[in-house]
Amino acid sequence: MAQKIIKVRDIEIANDKPFVLFGGINVLESRDLAMQACEEYVRVTEKLGIPYVFKASFDKANRSSITSFRGPGLEEGMKIFEEVKKTFGVPVITDVHEPHQAAAVAEVCDIIQLPAFLSRQTDLVVAMAKTGAVINIKKAQFLAPQEMKHILTKCEEAGNDQLILCERGSSFGYNNLVVDMLGFGIMKQFEYPVFFDVTHALQMPGGRADSAGGRRAQVTDLAKAGMSQGLAGLFLEAHPDPENAKCDGPCALRLNKLEPFLSQLKQLDDLVKSFPPIETA
């Protein structure tokens, strides 16, 4: 099965190529934190030879509580992203929540992300697609893998085939998510690159009453399980002080564990992609 290659600058993203990291922090808590985190990601990924894209949100529009921290907003967020790009020379990905934001975000960011909760919102999907930017489509927690085909079609009909799919877990009762490993293979049949958002798959939505809980201790186990499926990339959030992170701290990898964590995943990805395919249909 031929796999589509999506290009972001000089990075080639495909299910049969070495994995790409979309990594960063959950939300732009501050300019200084963004710079600190990106510097460490760049150091580690350059050392390990992993293609890298910095990620963060300028607005967390779907927080549990009205009092939850949301971020600096569109204008200030784009300024921070521009500084990150200029300082470190890396591409940037961020999420778009409303149709009117799409064009402005696409002017600055190399990849724009369709949030899982909003992935069926046709007006948003079409507005993002019409920018012509590469789009990372998060699979909603309530959608089956095969239903992602409809979202791909919406983008294609709007004239955009620069698309990436991203698994982030499925609802499993209340306050819990699970990852169906068979879903990766189903989505790979669409031939677009497939990523695994291990950070948000560790969430326990609403698990702390007014915010999400998480299972950071299991990040390595879940990441290895997902990346053993031969994927285009990994989506990861890390933080220097997860206990005091302003969003999703319980799911975030400790930033000082980034190098050993990614080193093991790089070795696993290289091994899995060295195997010849076996036809079992």
From Swiss-Prot:
Taxonomy, superkingdom: Bacteria
Any one of the GO BP annotations: keto-3-deoxy-D-manno-octulosonic acid biosynthetic process
EC number: 2.5.1.55
Keyword terms, alphabetized: Cytoplasm, Lipopolysaccharide biosynthesis, Transferase
Intracellular or extracellular location(s): Cytoplasm
Catalyzed reactions per annotation: D-arabinose 5-phosphate + phosphoenolpyruvate + H2O = 3-deoxy-alpha-D-manno-2-octulosonate-8-phosphate + phosphate
Enzyme class name: transferase
Any one Gene Ontology molecular-function term assigned to this protein's record: 3-deoxy-8-phosphooctulonate synthase activity
Pfam family, one: DAHP_synth_1
Pathway: Carbohydrate biosynthesis; 3-deoxy-D-manno-octulosonate biosynthesis; 3-deoxy-D-manno-octulosonate from D-ribulose 5-phosphate: step 2/3; Bacterial outer membrane biogenesis; lipopolysaccharide biosynthesis
GO cellular component: cytoplasm
InterPro entries according to UniProt: Aldolase_TIM, DAHP1/KDSA, KDO8P_synthase
Family: Belongs to the KdsA family.
PANTHER family: PHOSPHO-2-DEHYDRO-3-DEOXYHEPTONATE ALDOLASE (PTHR21057)
Protein name: 2-dehydro-3-deoxyphosphooctonate aldolase
Gene for this chain: kdsA
